[in-house]
Swiss-Prot record:
It comes from Lactuca sativa. It catalyses: a plastoquinone + NADH + (n+1) H(+)(in) = a plastoquinol + NAD(+) + n H(+)(out); a plastoquinone + NADPH + (n+1) H(+)(in) = a plastoquinol + NADP(+) + n H(+)(out). It is a peripheral membrane protein. The gene is ndhJ. The lineage of its organism: Eukaryota, Viridiplantae, Streptophyta, Embryophyta, Tracheophyta. GO terms for molecular function: NADH dehydrogenase (ubiquinone) activity; quinone binding. The keyword Electron transport does not apply. This is NAD(P)H-quinone oxidoreductase subunit J, chloroplastic. NDH is composed of at least 16 different subunits, 5 of which are encoded in the nucleus. One of its GO terms (biological process) is photosynthesis, light reaction. GO terms for cellular component: chloroplast thylakoid membrane. It is found in: Plastid, Chloroplast thylakoid membrane. It is an enzyme of class 7 (translocase). The keyword Aminoacyl-tRNA synthetase does not apply. HAMAP family: NDH1_NuoC. NDH shuttles electrons from NAD(P)H:plastoquinone, via FMN and iron-sulfur (Fe-S) centers, to quinones in the photosynthetic chain and possibly in a chloroplast respiratory chain. The immediate electron acceptor for the enzyme in this species is believed to be plastoquinone. Couples the redox reaction to proton translocation, and thus conserves the redox energy in a proton gradient.
Length: 158
């Protein structure tokens, strides 16, 4: 089943894949990493001016990594804002996705957290570095194949 936004993207020749609807009726679309930045700009111009959240997850051990964006279209006088969920999948060996920081500035810390926990590199992000783990941390703690170290020494702050 194709939703309103998916039909609009098809009409304008923008490549994507419809993943259906979630339990709240929000349309979910898959966008290829190479197309994501240009489609993000188009969605912003189309009215999806609010990035509600961004997160990432490990799809399966040894499989793809996913970056998920929840966008909202807020219009004056509209009874209900339109929402869409965008999923961008990246290969585990070199997970690179274009950053949308220059489209939605609120994604700054969220993309940094996804980088820190899963190792997804967001190209053209102005400050892509660890945000939760120490800079010296090795590995990506939320990957399903991550092996936690037996010991990690926290240095004294003095």
């Amino acid at each position: 089943m194709q939703g309103h936004l998916s039909a609009w993207l098809v009409k304008h020749g923008l490549i994507h894949r419809s993943l259906g609807f979630d339990y709240q009726g929000i349309e979910t679309l898959q966008i290829k990493p190479g197309d994501w930045h240009s489609i993000a700009v188009i969605l912003y111009v189309y009215g999806y001016n609010y990035l509600r959240s961004q997160c990432a997850y490990d799809v399966a051990p040894g499989g793809l990594l996913a970056s998920v964006y929840h966008l909202t279209r807020i219009e004056y006088g509209a009874d209900q804002p339109e929402e869409v969920c965008i999923k961008v999948f990246a290969p585990r060996r070199d997970p690179r996705i274009p950053s949308v920081f220059w489209v939605w500035k609120s994604v700054d810390f969220q993309e940094r957290e996804s980088y820190d926990m899963l190792g997804i590199s967001y190209d053209n992000h102005p400050r892509l570095k660890r945000i939760l783990m120490p800079e010296s941390w090795i590995g990506w703690p939320l990957r399903k194949d991550y092996i936690a170290p037996n010991f990690y020494e926290i240095q004294d702050a003095h």
